Amino acid sequence: MAARPMLVVALLCAAAAAATAQQATNVRATYHYYRPAQNNWDLGAPAVSAYCATWDASKPLSWRSKYGWTAFCGPAGAHGQASCGKCLQVTNPATGAQITARIVDQCANGGLDLDWDTVFTKIDTNGIGYQQGHLNVNYQFVDCRD
């Protein structure tokens, strides 16, 4: 019977570790001009050519336009196809501004590449990110509520 409480404790610790692994702080976030509205929220449009288009381009317009777009290559969370369509709550800790963004692409900068129109400008409320060419943000994976 003593083994059962130990198992419960072990499972709780594992769950806490998994939850912690789905967020990161002080992550470099650059910007990219996906221009989703100008491209009819089409992930496969030549001007967009998002990595996740293979799996998500045929999703309904309401799904593709529900959140702003981001490329993801952050230090915590799944990468590649496994990250496609997932949502991140991205916070600018300098201002407290936050927004939910959908992962539609991959990147190579070790962080995020936020769409200029739908994400970056919404959390760069003091203009410092534009001046520096990037923001340092916090992110966590959240339920997209689709």
Swiss-Prot record:
EC nos: 3.1.-.-
Reported effect, H134L: Loss of antifungal activity. Reduces ribonuclease activity 92%
Top enzyme class: hydrolase
Signal sequence extent: 1-21
Regulation acting on activity, per entry: Inhibited by 5'-ADP.
Induction / repression: Up-regulated by fungal infection, salicylic acid (SA), benzo (1,2,3) thiodiazole-7-carbothioic acid S-methyl ester (BTH), methyl jasmonate (MeJA) and wounding.
Intrachain S-S bonds: C52-C84, C73-C107, C87-C144
Pfam families: Barwin
InterPro entries: Barwin_CS, Barwin_dom, PR4, RlpA-like_sf
Positions of post-translational Pyrrolidone carboxylic acid modification: Q22
Swiss-Prot/TrEMBL keywords: Antimicrobial, Disulfide bond, Fungicide, Hydrolase, Hypersensitive response, Nuclease, Pathogenesis-related protein, Plant defense, Pyrrolidone carboxylic acid, Signal
GO BP terms in the entry: defense response to bacterium; defense response to fungus; killing of cells of another organism; plant-type hypersensitive response
Effect on the protein of changing H32L: Loss of antifungal activity. Reduces ribonuclease activity 62%. Reduces ribonuclease activity 92%
Gene Ontology MF annotations: RNA nuclease activity
Record-annotated Barwin domain positions: 22-146
Subunit structure: Monomer.
Role according to the record: Shows antifungal activity towards B.cinerea and towards the wheat-specific pathogenic fungi F.culmorum and F.graminearum (groups 1 and 2). Has ribonuclease activity.
Protein name in UniProt: Wheatwin-1
Organism per entry: Triticum aestivum (Wheat)
Organism lineage string: Eukaryota, Viridiplantae, Streptophyta, Embryophyta, Tracheophyta
Gene behind this protein: PR4A
